Amino acid sequence: MSFIKPIYQDINSILIGQKVKRPKSGTLSGHAAGEPFEKLVYKFLKENLSDLTFKQYEYLNDLFMKKPAIIGHEARYKLFNSPTLLFLLSRGKAATENWSIENLFEEKQNDTADILLVKDQFYELLDVKTRNISKSAQAPNIISAYKLAQTCAKMIDNKEFDLFDINYLEVDWELNGEDLVCVSTSFAELFKSEPSELYINWAAAMQIQFHVRDLDQGFNGTREEWAKSYLKHFVTQAEQRAISMIDKFVKPFKKYIL
């Protein structure tokens, strides 16, 4: 289930032609270029799905503010009612322990989701990716392959297959003078991709990388089948990587220490 998908064409219509100023610092392929477009998406969703739409840190602040008598990280963690969502959305023990009205969470670049949509105990985690289509560039980091493996394991252990989606919106832009101009968008659902085709870049902090517009959406199995298929893919890739690392970095030097 996606709250975004039914209104995606509206989002697409609003975004195409939108201009944001070229960042004064940072690279055009980095966070500085993407953040203004992400803010436009958030603004649209906040205006049209106001009761559902949060930044991840806003949701956590709201969750804890509704239960001010609950203190301590262990008690606050129980508010999630889901080990998988706790893993995906929560902050660390110290930060959760020290949270207060005077010490609210702030946005972190490594939050799992740029935008979180919540309704009837279902969560849609949305990440906004941007792409300079004037240049051929490596696909962006999407999510840690290890973090996704841990997520799949928790889904299976706790039989939590219908609580959340992880989806992506790509904003394609071109540089026009001092402006970045949106020329197209794409939307894709992680759990509709073929797990065995996800590219893991082990040299880039084990990140799964893809362009949203290129992500296959042909998987027709259950969420449990997706999780198990991904774990098989991850383990196979990890085993191959381990063999490669030993062959390259261990075997040539072992004779010197034996």
UniProtKB/Swiss-Prot annotation:
What molecular function does GO assign, one term? type II site-specific deoxyribonuclease activity
Transport: is it a keyword of this entry?
Answer: no
Catalytic reactions on record: Endonucleolytic cleavage of DNA to give specific double-stranded fragments with terminal 5'-phosphates
Question: Which Gene3D superfamilies does the UniProt entry name for this protein?
Answer: DNA mismatch repair MutH/Restriction endonuclease, type II (3.40.600.10)
Q: Which GO terms describe its biological process?
A: DNA restriction-modification system
Name the SUPFAM superfamilies on file. Answer: Restriction endonuclease-like
**InterPro entries reported in the protein's UniProt record:** DNA_rep_MutH/T2_RE_sf, Restrct_endonuc-II-like, Restrct_endonuc_II_HincII
EC number(s) stated in the UniProt entry for this protein: 3.1.21.4
Keywords assigned by UniProt, alphabetized? Endonuclease, Hydrolase, Nuclease, Restriction system
The keyword Ribosomal protein appears for this protein? no
This one is known as: Type II restriction enzyme HindII
What species was this sequence derived from? Haemophilus influenzae (strain ATCC 51907 / DSM 11121 / KW20 / Rd)
